[in-house]
Amino acid sequence: MSEHASQSTLNRFFHAPLKEVDAEVATILNEELTRQQDGIELIASENMASFAVMEAQGSVLTNKYAEGLPGKRYYGGCVDVDRVENLAIDRLKKIFGAEFANVQPHSGANANQAAFMALAKPGDTVLGLSLAAGGHLTHGAAPNYSGKWFNSVQYGVRAEDGLIDYDQMEALAREHKPKIIVAGSSAYPRVIDFARFRKIADEVGAYLMVDMAHFAGLVAAGLYPNPVPMADITTSTTHKTLRGPRGGIILTNNPDLAKKVNSAVFPGLQGGPLMHVIAGKAVAFGEALSDEFKAYQKRVLANARALADELQNRGFDIVTGGTDSHLILVDLRPKKVTGKLAEAILERAGITANKNAIPFDPEKPFVTSGIRLGSPAATARGFGEAEFREVGRMIDEVLTAALEEDNAEAVTARVHEEVKALCRRFPIYDRASA
């Protein structure tokens, strides 16, 4: 037996495409590509990354370990990964006007956990928007580390209009004197008053942390208030409205907090950063600095408002009465259908959405009375306001027919064909991977 691998073995290892090496995985990827090509994606937390972002993410950088920060690594051979990480950092700081940035968090949840570690100790009090009112798990929800490691106090929204109850938030802050006040959400469609959060944080001696995961792209385009100048720490994902690879980021203008953040990310939470993902982030941040990206975000906002208006005109109850962002929360009770059922029916018609609790929801969390809709992904493929109004019509027809046993299947099948025809007018990737 030769001590060396054969040349044919090496050629296959370094050059053979996925379909030759693993047909089973290749088939799954191609079927997912078909699903994305032929379906309308309305999940507000999803988007479509550019092919350039995916190419960077599927690069040789996946081979490289790089624990530490640029210029201060625990491994050799980091000259090129240092360059790409510094590029990502510099671009990110330019986008949001931040003094310091960490691009290493593997996810938004990791970014939030690192921010909590930098700002507080286990047992400290944290004040965040409740999950039931549109907050995120990582903002103090009981099942999450943020609700287990910290004394979590939750504010909510007003029953009469679904808007954040700032008076309640301020009263709770004065009563509990939290170490951190969290502003941000996963299902809140309106602009957040960061100045009011900053004022009460200063009054009670709290840090202000803003999670802008959902609206970061709109901030980058100047269409949503920038929280970075007012927050002690700002976190975000990179794959929602920022339209990049899946991952997280942390921003601050405070040099002392920057050091704490860096230590919290590594060695506090993570080992080696995912350098191939950081390369994808660098590409996405470069795109976010372009005029095209700003125009895209304007369409994201206009399209969300068009969809909300169309659904409202068709008898749907839009929580808060509209949207200031990419996101719409729909109360389905006037249509007498649950979020769980609506999600399943829409998926059969080629429209992907997610069931979502509405404020003061009487249904269980896995059933819900609402659905959450978002415009980023369909806007990325080219849909405009007219197409989003068509989507609103399709949603109405399918969900209305769902209550008519004799007609539901035929309507769903017809709308599914309309969905595929609409999607073919706005094609996306022609292959599943770079």
From Swiss-Prot:
GO terms for biological process: glycine biosynthetic process from serine; tetrahydrofolate interconversion. It catalyses: (6R)-5,10-methylene-5,6,7,8-tetrahydrofolate + glycine + H2O = (6S)-5,6,7,8-tetrahydrofolate + L-serine. The record marks H239 as: Plays an important role in substrate specificity. The keyword Transmembrane does not apply. It comes from the Bacteria. Its main location: cytoplasm. Its EC number is 2.1.2.1. Its cofactor is pyridoxal 5'-phosphate. (6S)-5,6,7,8-tetrahydrofolate binds at L131, G135, H136, L137. It is found in: Cytoplasm. SUPFAM superfamilies: PLP-dependent transferases (SSF53383). InterPro entries: PyrdxlP-dep_Trfase (IPR015424), PyrdxlP-dep_Trfase_major (IPR015421), PyrdxlP-dep_Trfase_small (IPR015422), Ser_HO-MeTrfase (IPR001085), Ser_HO-MeTrfase-like (IPR049943), Ser_HO-MeTrfase_PLP_BS (IPR019798), SHMT-like_dom (IPR039429). Transmembrane segments: none annotated. Keywords: Amino-acid biosynthesis, Cytoplasm, One-carbon metabolism, Pyridoxal phosphate, Transferase. GO terms for cellular component: cytosol. Pathway: One-carbon metabolism; tetrahydrofolate interconversion; Amino-acid biosynthesis; glycine biosynthesis; glycine from L-serine: step 1/1. The modification N6-(pyridoxal phosphate)lysine is found at K240. GO terms for molecular function: glycine hydroxymethyltransferase activity; pyridoxal phosphate binding. Gene3D superfamilies: Aspartate Aminotransferase, domain 1, Type I PLP-dependent aspartate aminotransferase-like (Major domain). PANTHER family: SERINE HYDROXYMETHYLTRANSFERASE, SERINE HYDROXYMETHYLTRANSFERASE 1. NCBIfam families: PRK00011.1 (NF000586). Belongs to the SHMT family. Catalyzes the reversible interconversion of serine and glycine with tetrahydrofolate (THF) serving as the one-carbon carrier. This reaction serves as the major source of one-carbon groups required for the biosynthesis of purines, thymidylate, methionine, and other important biomolecules. Also exhibits THF-independent aldolase activity toward beta-hydroxyamino acids, producing glycine and aldehydes, via a retro-aldol mechanism. Homodimer. This is Serine hydroxymethyltransferase. The gene is glyA.
